[in-house]
């Protein structure tokens, strides 16, 4: 399974695209398609695996989640990866673990809306979820903080869309 990485941004932070692209391609892969979702196209060239999609007129913050929901309703991706625009990679990504996550999502019959790619969950209240090829997977308990986060996660598109208000 090959999925795209989507990164919502705003005009004020378009300048972050260049350093993000550099660190992403250095520490992960130029084979992953990265799609920035913003408003005004940046005035610099993007690497071949990066593209910018304008969500329309940059009118108000109140419309931001509506613009994202409308965009994600317009695509057919079953799964997508998402992070925030200021979450740059600082070291090599373990591609084998990422591939294991994709393999699990393809093979499991369990309902999953969001699969976190960061290790932060183990510092909050969690419980064992499943084991896949020798790796333990955990889920946040209902009382845990930040059960939904846009940082480095794989989302089932339908699940993501229903959480935009």
Please report, for each region that a protein language model flagged, where it lies by residue.
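N-proximal low-complexity "stem/linker" segments adjacent to membrane-targeting elements
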Residues: 1-19
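Short, charged/polar "capping" segments at the starts of alpha-helices
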Residues: 13-17, 41-47, 124-125
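Short, acidic, metal-binding catalytic loop of nucleotide-sugar glycosyltransferases
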Residues: 22-32
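Conserved nucleotide-sugar donor-binding
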Residues: 77, 148-164
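The conserved acidic donor/metal-binding loop of glycosyltransferases
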Residues: 86-88
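Conserved donor-nucleotide/metal-binding helix-loop-beta segment in metal-dependent transferases, i.e.
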Residues: 91-124
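Short, flexible, basic/aromatic active-site loop/helix in glycosyltransferases
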Residues: 128-145
């Amino acid at each position: 399974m090959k999925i795209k990485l989507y990164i919502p941004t705003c005009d004020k932070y378009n300048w972050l695209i260049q350093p993000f692209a550099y660190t992403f391609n250095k520490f992960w892969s130029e084979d992953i398609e990265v799609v920035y979702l913003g408003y005004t196209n940046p005035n610099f060239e993007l690497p071949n695996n990066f593209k910018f999609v304008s969500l329309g007129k940059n009118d108000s913050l109140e419309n931001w989640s509506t613009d994202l929901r409308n965009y994600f309703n317009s695509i057919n991706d079953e799964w997508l990866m998402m992070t925030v625009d200021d979450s740059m990679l600082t070291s090599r990504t373990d591609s084998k673990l990422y591939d294991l996550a994709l393999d699990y999502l393809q093979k499991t019959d369990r309902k999953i809306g969001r699969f976190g790619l960061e290790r932060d969950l183990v510092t909050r209240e969690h419980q064992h979820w499943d084991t896949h090829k020798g790796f333990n997977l955990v889920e946040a308990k209902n009382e845990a903080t930040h059960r939904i986060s846009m940082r480095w996660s794989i989302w089932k598109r339908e699940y993501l869309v229903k959480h935009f208000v």
